[in-house]
Amino acid sequence: MADGVSVSELVEKIRLDVFYGDELLEQKKVTVSDISRPGLELTNYFKFYPHERIQLFGETEISYAKDSMTKDERTKIYDRMADVDTPAFVVSRGLPIPEELIQAAKNNQVPILTSTLPTSRLLSNMTNFLEDRLAERDSIHGELLEIYGLGVLITGDSGIGKSETALDLIKRGHRLIADDRVDIYQQDEQTLIGEAPRILRHLLEIRGVGIIDVMNLFGASAVKNHTEISVIVHLQNWDKDAHFDRLGNGEQTRHFFELDIPKITIPVRVGRNLGDIIEAATMNFRAKNMGYDATKVFDRNLNELIKDNSQK
């Protein structure tokens, strides 16, 4: 997990306006992705107050404080909410900011940020950004491409031809996300995201050629910054004694964080066109996800044939 996201980065990415605390933005860190909307705190119940979270004020919170609380109550409550660990107060919808909230923020060095977005949309935008930035990360060796809209992670031993295969797939119109090193993180309970380290973004290394800039050579449509990893294609040197799945009914997976990602192992030997094979494997994987499994159709037809022959 990242050490924290500066409030300055949050302001830049979510396009927030700074009402107070420009000088505090770099030093204030957000360490959790959850956003708090004050509820019971406005009634002076602070037993479970999440002081380490961003505090988001929408129309409900601002209206309640204005209509149901006295000036002294607002001063007391807001001052308790402005904890030293609180990253920021955020006010949505361009709502007027209570004077007591401004004073509490100044007294306790808590930035005040504003946005014209509706509260629910602003909450979603901030949560999604923070979940991505604060997620646990890992790096793996391989190529990540988007093939027919699916994120395909190509793995295999060094020198087996992963980069050359990636180049072939790029020339066929597919997109490169990462070459050689892929940074991965779990976005949510069902999604694994892969991206390239910033210094390697859009670059591809080919032995004997060197490093090429894919975006400059093939255009912006040939690259993408990140994608969801849907399937792993593992390239393995051909071994006549090794067992390879011939029917496609053997399910393999590889575990990352809390997720098991489907895996397809492809034997590699001279004369096999890996670009064609990986395209076919990706299309077949997509077809299975849409409910059509060629292996099951073959099994059904075979069983029917055996049944018919046994009745003769």
Curated annotation (Swiss-Prot):
Binding site for ATP: 156-163
GO molecular function: ATP binding; magnesium ion binding; phosphorelay sensor kinase activity; protein serine/threonine kinase activity; protein serine/threonine/tyrosine kinase activity
InterPro entries: HPr(Ser)_kin/Pase (IPR003755), Hpr_kin/Pase_C (IPR011104), Hpr_kin/Pase_Hpr_N (IPR011126), P-loop_NTPase (IPR027417), Ser_kin/Pase_Hpr-like_N_sf (IPR028979)
Top-level EC class as recorded in UniProt: transferase
Keyword Flavoprotein annotated: no
Annotated segments matching region Important for the catalytic mechanism of both phosphorylation and dephosphorylation: 204-213
Residues annotated to bind Mg(2+): 163, 205
Domain comment as written in the entry: The Walker A ATP-binding motif also binds Pi and PPi.
Summary of the function given for this chain in its UniProt record: Catalyzes the ATP- as well as the pyrophosphate-dependent phosphorylation of a specific serine residue in HPr, a phosphocarrier protein of the phosphoenolpyruvate-dependent sugar phosphotransferase system (PTS). HprK/P also catalyzes the pyrophosphate-producing, inorganic phosphate-dependent dephosphorylation (phosphorolysis) of seryl-phosphorylated HPr (P-Ser-HPr).
NCBIfam families on file: hpr-ser
Assigned protein family: Belongs to the HPrK/P family.
Protein name: HPr kinase/phosphorylase
Lineage of source species: Bacteria, Bacillati, Bacillota, Bacilli, Lactobacillales
